[in-house]
């Protein structure tokens, strides 16, 4: 079969790398971020981390089977839309599948219990060379959504707060790739603040590479500081302490999802609501790595079960193998390809028209 592996952003490549390796021996694979190239390829199956609704991929390829790996484990209100657009959705455990079913969230054809493919290298990832020996590593990995991110709370004091007044710490700051990109005028000042705070600090490393795989940094961290990011759920696998910062405006954010594990399981770490509480929480976590371990163990089992063996990509590939009897024929894919080409050609114009109409409404 032809299998298209779609990544919208460069940082999605790390999510699908183990899946790509597992698929290539058995299938003709194309990994691309170009929807036009994907459409011309006419894949029988598409594996994508991205929410398919953003890009109208089904309109491009109406007969292809869509497999959604997710690009993070936090909900943020996305599964109700993105899961229903996919034929199959990969989840990390039976318990997680059952939670979504209880909420009435169903893919078109079913869930695949594979584990989370991005985490396949979590336990094997080497320690990044930027981290000096003998230091306790504090990893700060905030989300990017306005109202959820802790970046505005910490501001220019971010580095000093994370060091918690200790001399034995090395702080690593891993902004979300969309913050790193800096094109959004709402997000650009956050990156500028981080650069200024980390400048000339030998005890602090700011990750600037948008495509950087976060797994080696998670594996190296002694404590994770976050807010409502997916990394806090991935970090549960390592059984190390977390500090979670609540933005006071989180309940007003359109991405606040009280049904998401990022909020239902808030006691997975120390929960704080002010910047001034951060140093004490970080120091407590570093002094007692077993802090909160009992709750973390409960959530880790529910989230991952026994699927932390680094073989999630292989399990996904085996499920793709089994799709052969149900995929469209080459003749069928060829017959509908003019539809895909027409959609790909016209979509930019439709988007521009939609934006112009919205601007007109706002100015009226």
Regions found by a protein language model. Give the residues of each.
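Conserved catalytic-core segment of nucleotide-activated headgroup transferases in glycan assembly
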Residues: 4-7, 12-23, 119-193, 272, ...
């Amino acid at each position: 079969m032809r299998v298209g592996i779609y990544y919208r952003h460069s940082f999605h490549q790390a999510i699908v790398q183990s899946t790509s390796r597992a698929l290539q021996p058995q299938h003709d694979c194309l990994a691309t971020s170009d929807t036009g190239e994907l459409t011309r390829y006419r894949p029988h199956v598409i594996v994508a981390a991205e929410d398919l609704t953003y890009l109208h991929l089904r309109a491009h390829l109406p007969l292809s089977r869509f497999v959604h790996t997710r690009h993070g484990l936090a909900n943020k209100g996305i599964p109700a839309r993105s899961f229903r657009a996919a034929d199959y959705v990969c989840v990390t455990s039976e318990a997680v599948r059952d939670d979504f079913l209880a909420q009435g969230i169903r893919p078109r054809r079913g869930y695949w219990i594979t584990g989370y493919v991005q985490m396949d290298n979590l336990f094997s990832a080497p320690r990044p060379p930027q981290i000096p020996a003998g230091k306790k590593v504090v990893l700060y990995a905030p989300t990017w959504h306005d109202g959820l991110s802790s970046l505005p709370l910490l501001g220019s004091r971010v580095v000093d707060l994370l060091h918690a007044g200790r001399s034995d710490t090395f702080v690593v700051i891993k902004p979300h790739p969309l913050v790193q990109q800096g094109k959004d005028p709402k997000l650009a000042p956050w990156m500028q603040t981080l650069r200024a705070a980390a400048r000339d600090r030998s005890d602090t490393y700011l990750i600037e590479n948008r495509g950087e795989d976060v797994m080696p940094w998670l594996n190296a961290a002694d404590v994770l500081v976050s807010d409502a990011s997916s990394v806090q759920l991935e970090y549960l696998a390592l059984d190390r302490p977390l500090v979670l910062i609540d933005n006071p405006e989180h309940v007003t954010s359109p991405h606040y999802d009280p049904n998401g594990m990022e909020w239902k399981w808030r006691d997975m770490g120390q929960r704080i609501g002010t910047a001034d509480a951060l140093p004490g929480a970080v120091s407590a976590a570093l002094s007692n790595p077993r802090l909160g371990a009992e709750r973390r163990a409960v959530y880790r089992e529910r989230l991952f079960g026994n699927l932390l063996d680094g073989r999630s990509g292989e399990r996904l590939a085996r499920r793709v193998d089994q799709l052969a009897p149900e995929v469209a024929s080459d003749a069928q894919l060829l017959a509908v390809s003019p539809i895909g080409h027409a959609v790909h050609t016209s979509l930019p114009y439709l988007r521009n028209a939609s934006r112009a109409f919205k601007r007109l409404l706002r100015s009226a």
